[in-house]
């Protein structure tokens, strides 16, 4: 069974936090030359490439605060480690916006955007870069009944400069995926959308603009990532029962 860094994507999918957008304009002309050029090629990356990325874990304590980081980025924060009824010290951020400014390298282009609230009325945020959803970029907050922020967890993907204008149109990407799976991208539980996903490059993860094909029926499905600039299939992930294969 495949495990490691990239396997976490399956967990995010099952939690329903992976972002999706529309299927795009299917009336666009297909670039048959590009489709032919990439047809039959194996995906650029395997799960071993993702598992080879170093993971540096760090835990910081400050008063009642406990902050967990992975590769220098905050992944989990608890402001009340002394118990639910204890007063946090130092005082936690008053709002989600204050939290993001303090703990994450958000920019005018790279933002956390409110998504919804769960059954406890705690807010969930999803990450967007220049209006394009970022795979695995999300944050969940937890609040006390009095409105005090208790903590949160999630993931923020730093992105410097990235061209979000695809060279490959949606129709061409759909055809590339259909050739790869030898089937249709139409049907229940299937969709394809433009997004941003990080892939291995020189020992670290670097974001790329991609088309994501998602097929999900209950706990079984697959993902295919197509480079939105070159048309190459970058990665293929299948999962069943929440576990990748």
Predicted feature residues:
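Bacterial Sec-dependent N-terminal signal peptides
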Residues: 4-5, 12-44
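Sequence-pattern detector for short linear motifs
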Residues: 5-6, 177
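Segments that shape or occlude catalytic/ligand-binding pockets
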Residues: 30-245
């Amino acid at each position: 069974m495949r495990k490691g860094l990239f396997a976490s994507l399956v967990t995010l999918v099952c939690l329903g936090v992976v972002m999706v957008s529309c299927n795009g304009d299917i009336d666009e002309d297909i670039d048959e030359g590009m489709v032919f050029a990439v047809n039959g090629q194996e995906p650029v990356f395997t799960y071993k490439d993702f598992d080879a990325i170093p993971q540096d874990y760090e835990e910081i304590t400050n008063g009642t605060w406990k902050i967990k980081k992975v590769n220098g980025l905050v992944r989990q924060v608890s402001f009340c480690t002394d118990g639910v009824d204890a007063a946090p010290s130092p005082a936690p951020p008053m709002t989600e916006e204050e939290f993001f400014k303090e703990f994450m390298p958000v920019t005018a282009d790279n933002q956390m955007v409110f998504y919804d609230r769960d059954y406890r009325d705690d807010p969930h945020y999803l990450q967007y870069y220049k209006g394009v959803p970022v795979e695995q970029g999300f944050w969940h907050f937890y609040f006390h009944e009095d409105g005090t922020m208790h903590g949160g967890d999630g993931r923020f993907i730093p992105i410097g400069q990235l061209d979000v204008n695809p060279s490959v149109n949606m129709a061409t990407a759909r055809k590339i995926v259909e050739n790869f799976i030898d089937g249709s991208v139409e049907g229940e539980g299937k969709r394809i959308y433009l997004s941003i996903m990080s892939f291995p490059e020189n020992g670290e993860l670097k974001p790329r603009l991609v088309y994501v094909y998602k097929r999900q029926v209950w706990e079984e499905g697959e993902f295919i990532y197509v480079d939105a600039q070159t048309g190459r299939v970058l990665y293929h992930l299948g999962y069943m029962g929440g576990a990748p294969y």
